[in-house]
Structures are given as structure tokens and as C-alpha cells.
């Protein structure tokens, strides 16, 4: 198995183990995580090819941040999560699978945040598009963009926002 595939597998196994006691996500099997979480992120890997810094906020159990950090070891990732048990898990997972390009913060992103600037800001299933952008736009480089993962039931109008790449996940 390739190194990246081994890291993803180790991440999923650790996630399932922690999930039994920490209730990190709804999924309870490896296949559910692959079908409902990992497959959402895979189509967008190429969006990151020119980035040097990425903020993933509201990362939950580490998706998409951990997966993107595995795929792009030369990009520096900051993964921010406001729920302590989830931030602890993400930090533990990053150490467990040997991600040297990842910094995990237990923090809430707001208009007063002083992180960054970042080439790309991502989040998945966190708040509204308007709230996401309003809370973090000051953290984005001038040439950067938001990559928001929203389900089919969520409507994003990218024309309404500068620096937004909207992608519908299955």
C-alpha cells in the first residue's frame, strides 16, 4: 500500500476507535466513512495544487483537513475546531499518522481571528455561506479563495461572493 493510502487507513481506524467513546461523527463503519465523507473530498484534490497555506475550520473529526493534508504534504494546513474533544482527536490523529504539515487549534473562527493569511479556506457543513465568509474573509490572501463543501440541499451562488469556488458534494 502507498504511504498516503496507509495514512488514510490509519486515520479511519483511529477515528472509528475514538468514535465509540467520543461520539465524533454519525458514521460507525469504515465503508460509511468512505462513502459519505472521503468521497466528498476526493474530487477536489486538484484545487490545492498551487496553495502553500490552507485553513480548514469547523473540521469536526478532521474532514476534509486531515485528508487534504495527507494528499498535499508540501502544503501547510491549519485545522481549527471549536469543540475540544474533536480538536484533541484531530491533533492526536495528525500525530498518529505522521502529518508534519498540520497545526491543530482548539478555537472558534470569528471576525476577530488573527490567523493567516491563507491561500485557501475550506469548511464542510459548517454554518451558512454568508456566515463562513463574514467570519473568515480577513484571513484570506488577496489572491486566495474559499472552497466550501455543501450538500445538494444547500444552495451557493458563487456570483454573490468574490473569491468563492462552490462545489456540490453528493
Question: What residue ranges belong to the model's regions?
Answer:
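Conserved class I S-adenosyl-L-methionine
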Residues: 151-161
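Single conserved hydrophobic/aromatic residue that forms the stacking wall/gate
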Residues: 163-170
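A short SAM/SAH-binding and catalytic strip from SAM-dependent methyltransferases
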Residues: 120-130
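Class I SAM-dependent transferase core
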Residues: 1-50, 96-97
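Conserved SAM/SAH cofactor-binding pocket of Class I
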Residues: 42-117, 123
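Conserved beta-strand signature within the Rossmann-like core of class I S-adenosyl-L-methionine
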Residues: 144-151
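A short glycine-rich, Lys/Arg-flanked "PGG" loop and its adjoining helix->strand segment in the class I
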Residues: 133-142
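A short helix->loop->beta-strand "cap" motif at the edges of active sites that frequently abuts
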Residues: 75, 143-144
Amino acid at each position: 500500500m502507498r504511504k498516503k493510502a496507509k495514512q488514510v487507513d490509519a486515520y479511519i481506524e483511529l477515528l472509528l476507535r475514538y468514535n465509540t467513546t467520543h461520539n465524533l461523527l454519525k458514521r460507525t463503519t469504515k465503508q460509511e466513512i468512505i462513502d459519505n465523507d472521503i468521497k466528498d473530498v476526493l474530487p477536489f484534490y486538484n484545487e490545492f495544487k498551487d496553495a502553500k497555506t490552507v485553513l480548514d475550520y469547523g473540521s469536526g473529526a478532521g474532514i476534509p483537513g486531515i485528508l487534504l493534508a495527507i494528499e498535499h504534504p508540501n502544503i501547510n494546513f491549519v485545522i481549527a475546531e471549536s469543540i475540544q474533544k474533536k480538536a484533541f482527536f484531530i491533533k492526536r490523529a495528525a500525530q498518529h499518522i505522521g502529518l508534519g504539515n498540520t497545526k491543530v487549534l482548539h478555537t472558534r473562527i470569528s471576525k476577530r481571528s488573527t490567523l493567516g493569511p491563507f491561500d485557501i479556506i475550506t469548511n464542510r457543513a459548517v454554518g451558512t455561506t454568508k456566515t463562513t465568509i463574514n467570519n473568515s474573509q480577513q484571513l484570506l490572501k488577496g489572491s486566495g479563495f474559499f472552497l466550501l463543501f455543501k450538500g445538494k440541499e444547500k444552495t451557493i451562488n458563487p456570483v454573490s461572493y468574490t473569491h468563492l469556488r462552490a462545489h456540490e458534494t453528493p
